[in-house]
Amino acid sequence: MRLSIFSISRNGQAMSHSFHPPQRILMGPGPSDVSARVLGALGRPTIGHLDPLFIELMDDTKQLLQYVFKTQNELTIPLSAPGSAGMEAAFVNLVSPGDTVIVCQNGVFGGRMKENVERCGAHAVMVQDRWGDPVDPQKVEEAFAAHPDANLLAFVHAETSTGVRSDAKTLCELAQRHDALTIVDTVTSLGGIDLCVDDWGADAVYSGTQKCLSCVPGLSPMTFSPKAVSRIQNRATKIQSWFLDMQLVMGYWGGNSKRAYHHTAPVNALYALHESLLILQEEGLDASFARHRANHLELVSGLEAMGLSMAVTPEWRLPQLNAVCIPDGTDDATVRSRLLHEFNLEIGAGLGELAGKQWRIGLMGHASNPVNVQQCLTALRHVLGH
């Protein structure tokens, strides 16, 4: 049934009215289902973004983010913008005109990293891997050997477009051996698989709230190492974005009671993020990772029993984002449309060169549970005629 937010008045004019969305089961690549507890936090009374109580919430949110990132980095914040802005913030702060940056691409989002490097006036050296494979550390080593002036390595930990995990620990260690900093995309990995910022030595790490954290979209958790902060503070050129300039943002998220006004933070969205991080802390990171993996294995077993094939080898699969090969003769859009309209179930289409070839089934955060696994399998059996 199509819902409309418009009605026709007596004089024939269109009138808007309140929007009441249906209750979907969100099993795509994000956003994921948001719990009633987080939605309840979102609806609490708004207070000022410099209110002493809100400052306390900011400090506690920072500590919770340090917990999930496994870091002691002082500059750990939820950027007041979505994950794509987190990506841009990492690049505009750490990349200067004329720099050489090694960018790993094994899916859509590595390509977006390249765009950011070039918009900063720097040179992107591309390390290409097949979409569906992890980043090959040997290729990265060869890129550093060919470009010894490279001062930054950028890669995606969990490639959202393909459902592939890359070996972030090895890649960060490789960059350190070449005196290069790292920018790491963890939009899909944070909260779903292990992420050890300090142990791995990652320098600028960004994520999103709408995936394994099961919060509303619109914020980008970020963390910067002391080495990254030093590079930001010692730049020879001004950061090209005022809003994303971490030297200014640090004044608002700093560790003292005198906060410098930079922008009006999305107060209620931060209530929601704080609540979602509390839920994750209560469960425990290891328990969250185990839950995601158990539900992933159950889903894969059911899909393979239907004759469907997974697109990624088991070692590198993301438990929170399952890439499934679309059977020959099956119309991608028709299947997804029927799932949505007959079962209120959303799964994702393939992106880029994988459009029409793969489905992406998310088991992220609050949505990663046995009930959703069985509902998804039942719906697919019905739609595919199994």
Regions found by a protein language model. Give the residues of each.
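Active-site C-terminal subdomain of aminotransferase-like
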Residues: 33-34, 210-301, 305
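Conserved beta-loop-alpha segment that forms the PLP phosphate-binding cup at the N-terminus of a helix
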Residues: 72-102, 106, 110-114
